[in-house]
Amino acid sequence: MANPTQIYSRDSKWRRGVMRSLVSELLLHGRIQTTLTRAKEVRGHAEKLITKAKAQSLASRRHAASFLRPLVTKDNKTLLQELFDTIAPKYKDRPGGYTRIYKLPKRDGDSTRMALIELV
């Protein structure tokens, strides 16, 4: 498979915006359905963000704040608070592999390979 960042034929602003949205939605909902290529790229961003959040430092909090969308959870907590207070402590003893990708059947309209990515 080719380099996922080159597949979209879009500029870096578009790619970064899509990745920010997908990672934010993944952390908010715990699982999302997207194309296989996007899921593989989201996995890297999400895992690095969770690993940095485990450090619980001011620098990691600022890095996450610059990347995540300003979404609010059901408990009226921001996504940043959810990441540092709930998600990161859950993976404290886990050295990596915080996400799992399931391959789904191809999409009807254009036969694109689909996948479900979820937090373990």
Curated annotation (Swiss-Prot):
Q: Which family does it belong to?
A: Belongs to the bacterial ribosomal protein bL17 family.
Pfam families xref list: Ribosomal_L17
Q: Name one GO cellular component term.
A: cytosolic large ribosomal subunit
Query: Which spans are transmembrane here?
Result: none
One GO term of the biological process aspect: translation
InterPro entries named among the record's database cross-references: Ribosomal_bL17 (IPR000456), Ribosomal_bL17_CS (IPR047859), Ribosomal_bL17_sf (IPR036373)
Molecular function as annotated in GO: structural constituent of ribosome
Is NADP given among the entry's keywords? no
Quaternary structure note: Part of the 50S ribosomal subunit. Contacts protein L32.
Q: What's the name of the protein?
A: Large ribosomal subunit protein bL17
Gene (name only): rplQ
Q: Which UniProt keywords apply?
A: Ribonucleoprotein, Ribosomal protein
